[in-house]
Amino acid sequence: MTDLCNLRCRYCMPDGVDKLEREDILTYEEFLRLAALFARCGVDTVRVTGGEPLVRKGVEQLVKGLKAIPGIRKVTMTTNAVLLEQQLPALLEAGLDSVNISLDTLDPALFAKITARDEFAAVQAGIHAALESGIPVKLNCVPQVGVNEGELEALAALAQDKPLQVRFIEMMPIGYGAAMPCISGPELLVRFRRRWPELAPLPGAACAALGDGPAVYYTVPGWKGDIGFIAAVHGKFCASCNRVRLTSQGFLRPCLASEAGCDLKALLRSGASDEELLTAIRTTIWEKPQEHHFELKQDIPATRGMYRIGG
């Protein structure tokens, strides 16, 4: 819903990137019109992302509008949590169902190095507020070679006494992350099992209950939370992928690794009817590529930042 962010993580949106013009971004009314059409196609879950969604004013009104759409059963948000503590009450009142929080380190100095901002205390306050509120919380960590790889066990251990899911997402070869080496999910699982030999996978039904996507979850008896792995490169899950992404500019992308898609904003602003938009949405979804080829690291523009796609 926005390309703006109040952090500058080097693998997503480093300093110096160009901002989009305001008129290039979909309005909330346009987002809601499209969301209602997606619901007519069978979409029942919407995740609000950015950039950082909380930097866009009135985001709680978007959440409220999404929750009012027939067929939409769940609205979630991915955030860096810098502004979460102050905005959480309004989001909860609007009906937000869960929150995913990006966190790559528990070290304030390393946090500042990764993000180029000194906001660790604000993020911790946001996480604490979310846990205290009772809303389901997931933490998303991107393991980075030579950066935070020594902290991954400490991050995983948060699930021991907190009711949350700590997920480890492989670095995707997209945009600024393409030049960075990947710590694979299977490699990380071996490491964690050396630390916690009792770490065992949750049954499929339990995994499904925790989320709507590709994460595979593990836990240790007695833990309050779980550890998840999203291994897009080393554990390709294309056959079961149930995602499409609508960028802040209104471009519908059926696959992160593909340039294929449809400019829904152009259709919206040229006066397209709902039926014409539905046809475009359905056609794009049906043309979703069979699988990605992240392992080949080709045909993916090096400057296509995740902050503009929906990270």
Name these PLM-found stretches:
Residues 3-5, 13-16, 103-105, 170, ...:
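Short, small-residue-rich loop/turn micro-motifs
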Residues 8, 12, 56, 109, ...:
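Residues that scaffold the ATP/ADP-binding catalytic core of kinase and kinase-like folds
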